[in-house]
Amino acid sequence: TMLFDSVAFKNIISNGLVLDKNGNKMSKRLGNAVDPFEVLEKYGTDAVRWYMISNSQPWDNLKFDVDGVDEVRRKFFGTLYNTYSFFALYANVDGFTGREAEIPVAERPEIDRWIISLLNTLVKEVTESLENYDPTPAARAIQDFVNENLSNWYVRLNRKRFWGGG
């Protein structure tokens, strides 16, 4: 670049065409075009970006479906938000500050060791995928971890414990 006498980007990933949900080219004339500003306003940029990166590889054509964006917003971001809200509520009730002494992993309950192990595996998988410029499997792995392991298993099996009853 002009400022730093170096290239602006070392690597670029370019996406393919964004098609309608049936795989046809979007066109105002055909009535299948989507106003991106309306979609961003209604669902938010994070949901749109996540939908696009998790739905298909960036270099493949993307069959864009607004219902898919809504599903990502509800099922992934909604689950992530609810999981965090659950944690924040009970952490505040218990006076958790994050400055407590760290409990060694070996001394934690088995279910805590399980989720930590899965998280470490997830970090490794996501790092490898991103280093190989393969973002879609990384996004899908994160989504699966949040929806299935963190929310459906870990939080549900630990509710009584988090509520102070176990």
Model feature map: region roles:
Residues 4-166:
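Long, charged, mostly alpha-helical binding arms that flank functional sites
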